[in-house]
From Swiss-Prot:
The keyword tRNA processing does not apply. GO terms for biological process: nitrogen fixation. May protect the nitrogenase Fe-Mo protein from oxidative damage. This is Nitrogenase-stabilizing/protective protein NifW. It comes from Trichodesmium erythraeum (strain IMS101). Homotrimer; associates with NifD. Belongs to the NifW family.
Length: 103
């Protein structure tokens, strides 16, 4: 049986994915680990706002949040998702290839 005590002992992305028995591609996790965990962390915070959930309901909601976070990065990437501030700011010192023209 999965418990919040067991859940709170988990450390890395693979631990969470294995705990919830979510099949995963190691390469996808290696490339997007921090982004997956950041999105999952937001999902956990949303679940925790609902204080009326039972332990089982929380675990189920956490699993859904992790599945969603992982699946997002199967079809997308960090630049598209803009999870971290570095991807949210437009850098002024960058010239895009589309802005270069040949005369």
């Amino acid at each position: 049986m999965k418990t919040l005590k067991n859940f709170n002992e988990l450390v890395d992305a693979e631990d969470f994915l294995n705990f919830f028995e979510i099949p995963f591609d190691q390469t996808t996790v290696n490339v997007n680990r921090l982004h997956i965990l950041k999105v999952f962390s937001s999902a956990i915070a949303e679940v925790d706002e609902n204080t009326k959930l039972t332990e089982t309901e929380k675990i189920t909601a956490y699993k859904a949040g992790l599945e969603s976070a992982y699946k997002t990065f199967l079809t997308s990437n960090a630049q598209e998702q803009k999870v971290f501030p570095v991807f949210q700011k437009e850098h002024k010192d960058v010239v895009k290839l589309t802005e270069i023209s040949a005369e």
